[in-house]
Amino acid sequence: MDNGESSSTNNSSRPWESYNTVFTNAKAGMEGVDKEKVQRVVYEMSKGSKYFQNEERKEALMKQKIEHMRDRCAKLSSLDLSNYQKVVDKRILELEATRDLSRIWLHVDMDAFYAAVETLSDPSIKGKPMAVGGLSMISTANYEARKFGVRAAMPGFIARKLCPDLIFVPVDFTKYTHYSDLTRKVFRNYDPHFIAGSLDEAYLDITEVCRERGLSGGEIAEELRSSVYSETGLTCSAGVAANRLLAKVCSDINKPNGQFVLQNDRSTVMTFVSFLPVRKIGGIGKVTEHILKDALGIKTCEEMVQKGSLLYALFSQSSADFFLSVGLGLGGTNTPQVRSRKSISSERTFAATGDERLLYSKLDELAEMLSHDMKKEGLTARTLTLKLKTASFEIRSRAVSLQRYTCSSDDILKHATKLLKAELPVSVRLIGLRMSQFVEEIRNSDPSQGTITKFIVQKDSSRQAQDLDDNDSFDLDANKNCLSNDESGNVSFGSHETSSAHLKDVVEYEERSQIDSGKVIPNQECMKKEERLQILEGDSLLKKYKECKPDTSHSMNDNSNATEAVSVFPQTEPLYWIDGYKCVLCGIELPPSFVEERQEHSDFHLAQRLQNEETGSSSSTTPSKRRILGKEKVNSKPKKQKPDQKDSSKHIPIHAFFTKSNQNSNETQRK
């Protein structure tokens, strides 16, 4: 009793000890940092702010998930666990059969890339603590600054508090892109088909180079790092292993300017991963780490195998497969098939402001940048999406279907201005623009037919009768878990995104509903609001809560051009897949590992809704409210109708041939 009182008193007098954010997580070069001091400073500087309130909300949701997971775990009987262990044993044999130790993968990561480039440009700041960014947000920090606890994605005013002598250098993406291109010239000498994770990292399959030249993976890594330094004057670190997942982990071991080689031997790999903290794995972020550790007692990768029965009992099969693969040291070994781009975007983070002139100026810059990138890649698109992050960290998205395909900065700015105007007045800390629905997609395929051929519906009657609460799943791409930056890359200052290669925490960005006895957990803020139709970024889909009214507080002005159908969806919740694999809108089943297909499926629903709105705006009849596979397709040339099809509006929609799950029955039967 006394111990409990003492602990409670200690927590109230030292509240920062329980305050964990992305800023308090160690990166390379932060090993000797006084973590308690960093926690205290971040806590004191953030307390009472909108960011602080948002972090508290997320912390409460995370604790709720942990308690929910504990409750479910406690309900499992020994017989349940025994049956799930049989599943685990069988799955281990199947996964082991896929182990490939014949490939040699190299992951190369530039050392504090932005900061290193700036130091190269201005040698006077060499050896001094510096950060790229400003007082509102920093993109990265050099190793001298990291010793004080300064790191990427940290507000500059907090970084200045931690390190009073910190030097700020403004972001210059033109410069970083130039040096990135130089490094990639070197990479192509070793693997013409290397995978670029971002501007400053890449994955190379060096199997053939090693075989042809009779060199080991370590020797090739040493040579490549030397070549990068000769070409750019910048240092990099490398990891060599049998697959991409392990290679990425290895590249972080001897940072900066070092390398680590993990031999292609099963026993060596198993020993390596046995004591590896789960947080070291790409795709496992703060939320997943805490759920695994606090709810299931899993701290290391080895324990994922030891407690595999719990994972398969409590998570979706795809998520459990990922965790089990990690515990076995398995990862991607084949070069992923090149896929066509589905969208292209640019965004900027800055100090929260409601100054309309400044916001329009930022929008102008983004339109120019996006147009430049599209012209560079020969792209024209028709769907424009505006993304806003408000001062209170609420994400809002607006989309418009343009009258023609374009890559013109004037066209982009014209429509983006209308979208922004509809949101004003608002205080914003991030603006982003994205173009999707490229003309190539329309010319080369029928959207509806393409979806049917790619997404085969496989129904499991036992799953249909299962309550959502019985299968809490996590979204992630098991094949691409090592193809992304640290989660902080998604909140870096002035990020310039032209691809969707960012993998987020497998739990933190899946705020899907947890259902207990038919009731939604009450603490989720969005549940208390009126229904909002949402268009979400990345691989997100439209989400709908039943028996609520639409929120029209952010709708477009009545004087909007009728031919430009605008959809307004404040983004307050991430994607929603029933049982972790079933689209809530149309019932199509897509495993979490199909990240690109989910993105395309999301874009299809968005485009279809915009098309329906366009049709409805020119028709006197009330448009259908069903958000399912559409009745029309977008094409530059009208498709010829069959002789017996006199009225295209009377055709039987393709979705009528598919059986919907119980969760979607109300949606699809509504007229």
From Swiss-Prot:
Q: Do you know which PANTHER family this protein is assigned to?
A: DNA POLYMERASE KAPPA, DNA REPAIR POLYMERASE UMUC / TRANSFERASE FAMILY MEMBER
Q: Which UniProt keywords apply?
A: DNA damage, DNA repair, DNA replication, DNA-binding, DNA-directed DNA polymerase, Magnesium, Metal-binding, Mutator protein, Nucleotidyltransferase, Nucleus, Transferase, Zinc, Zinc-finger
Name of the protein: DNA polymerase kappa
The residues the record assigns to binding Mg(2+) are: 109, 200
- What residue intervals correspond to the zinc fingers (UBZ3-type)? 576-613
Expression by tissue, per the entry, reads: Expressed in roots, leaves, stems, flowers and siliques. Present in endoreduplicating cells.
Q: Which GO terms describe its molecular function?
A: damaged DNA binding; DNA-directed DNA polymerase activity; single-stranded DNA binding; zinc ion binding
User: How does its activity get regulated?
Assistant: Unable to bypass a single 1,N(6)-ethenoadenine (epsilon-dA) or an abasic site lesions in DNA templates.
Q: Can you tell me which residues bind Zn(2+)?
A: 583, 586, 601, 605
Q: Which GO terms describe its cellular component?
A: nucleus
The lineage's top-level taxon is Eukaryota
Give the Pfam families listed for this entry: IMS, IMS_C, zf_UBZ
Amino acid composition bias (Polar residues), ranges on this chain: 659-671
Q: Which organism is it from?
A: Arabidopsis thaliana (Mouse-ear cress)
* Start and end residues of each UmuC domain: 105-285
